[in-house]
UniProtKB/Swiss-Prot annotation:
This is Galactokinase. GO terms for molecular function: ATP binding; galactokinase activity; magnesium ion binding. The keyword Magnesium applies. The lineage of its organism: Bacteria, Pseudomonadati, Pseudomonadota, Gammaproteobacteria, Vibrionales. Keywords: ATP-binding, Carbohydrate metabolism, Cytoplasm, Galactose metabolism, Kinase, Magnesium, Metal-binding, Nucleotide-binding, Transferase.
Length: 386
């Protein structure tokens, strides 16, 4: 993170002409288990990672917000918080920031303007929530600068609202919530219905290894929407608000009445919810053998029932599983049709996992992977006062 801090400080001073007063960060995240459960009112188990979005900031006495984006060549966006805050077609990055500020104002928070320089190293397009980290770090920045009475959960909800309503992208609450509330050496069990969170301790030295297949994700939006509709149809047939409310026993009694495809989709969600709750118990007990079994079952369910994995992802999972055996777990993470796998790996095996994948994956698929070795880290907060 030290490079990021240096970059935002330097760009702040160069572009805005004086020194910032505060450094604030918010992390990206990876979901260890609980896939496609969020919009079914279910459970997820993400952790925050040591890839962050970092801000250098200072408050202004007037109503102007000026933002410098280090990652877009020190491009500047400027707006007045007393005027209508509008969507910028030609500056997509700026809309996340504008949306967060607009939503904070709509929620009744009072503050003046600010100068902000922002940079991040959360890989974009890898499904590690670079956009949520940006939304959360901006909310956190206004909290810090103006001592706002806002909870971490509300910073997360405000970021989700900005993405849904201002940016115009539908997302659940998981990404913002873990970025806002993460804890070092812990995952977070999130109930997507009640928004209750529970910190779940992880074995301290465990590495969280994320491997991007770099398989271009085709069809992902249309297939995602289809899966969502199939889940909603199943919930209607069971007469419940969401599949969260269906037990596997109820499912088995009624399975013959369901369309075969809808049945497979519903079975994934129902069993995945149970797995996620059990995974939190296994992780807390530091039972990596059971955690590994649950992650393997999750992957098989995504592959066979939800049908969202691809050959490249299945290949990566098998390669990693051969190395870690019962000492950790591995599965696809994210929306599917490409993207990343996540593995919980004992430190002694990290190099072997990397070496195996580097030696075999490209030969098997023709694609070159990207490997990120992470730890579970703290959520958003103040890094330093300058």
């Amino acid at each position: 993170m030290s490079d990021l801090i240096q970059n935002v400080k330097t760009s702040f001073e160069q572009v805005l002409g004086y020194a910032p007063s505060h450094i604030i960060q918010a992390p990206g995240r990876v979901n260890l288990i609980g896939e496609h459960t969020d919009y079914n009112d279910g459970f997820v188990l993400p952790c925050a990672i040591n890839y962050q979005t970092v801000v250098a900031a200072a408050k202004r006495e007037d109503n102007l917000v000026r933002v410098v984006s280090v990652d877009y060549g020190n491009a500047v966006d400027e707006f007045d918080i007393t005027q209508e805050i509008t969507f910028q077609q030609d500056k997509m990055w700026a809309n996340y920031i504008r949306g967060v500020v607009k939503c904070l104002l709509a929620r009744g928070y009072q503050f003046s303007g600010a100068d902000i320089s922002v940079s991040g190293n959360v890989p974009q397009g890898a499904g590690l929530s670079s956009s949520a980290a940006l939304e959360v770090v901006i909310g956190q920045t206004f909290k810090v600068l103006f001592n706002l009475e806002i909870s971490q959960a509300e910073i997360a909800l405000n970021g989700q609202q900005a993405e849904n309503e201002f940016v115009g992208c539908n997302c659940g609450i998981m990404d913002q919530m873990i970025s806002a509330e993460g804890r070092e050496n812990h995952a977070m069990l999130l109930d997507c219905r009640s928004l209750e969170t529970e910190a779940v301790s992880m074995p301290e030295d465990m590495a969280v290894v994320i491997i991007n297949s770099n398989k271009k994700r085709g069809l992902v939006d249309s297939e995602y929407n289809t899966r969502r509709e199939q889940c909603e149809e199943a919930a209607r047939i069971f007469g419940v608000k969401a599949l969260r409310d269906v037990t596997i026993e109820q499912f088995n009694e009624k399975v013959s009445e369901l369309d075969e495809m809808v049945a497979k989709r519903a079975r994934h969600v129902i069993t995945e919810n149970d797995r996620t709750v059990e995974a939190a118990q296994a992780l807390r007990a530091h039972d990596m053998k059971r955690m590994g079994e649950l992650m393997a079952e999750s992957h098989a369910s995504m592959r066979d029932d939800f049908e969202i994995t691809v050959k490249e992802i299945d290949t990566l999972v098998e390669m990693v599983k051969e190395v870690i055996g019962e000492q950790g777990g591995v599965r696809m993470t994210g929306g599917g049709f490409g993207g990343c796998i996540v593995a919980i790996v004992p430190p002694a095996l990290v190099d072997e996992v990397k070496a195996t994948v580097e030696a075999k994956y490209q030969a098997a698929t023709g694609l070159k992977e990207s490997i990120y070795v992470c730890q579970a880290k703290n959520g958003a907060g103040l890094v330093e006062v300058l």
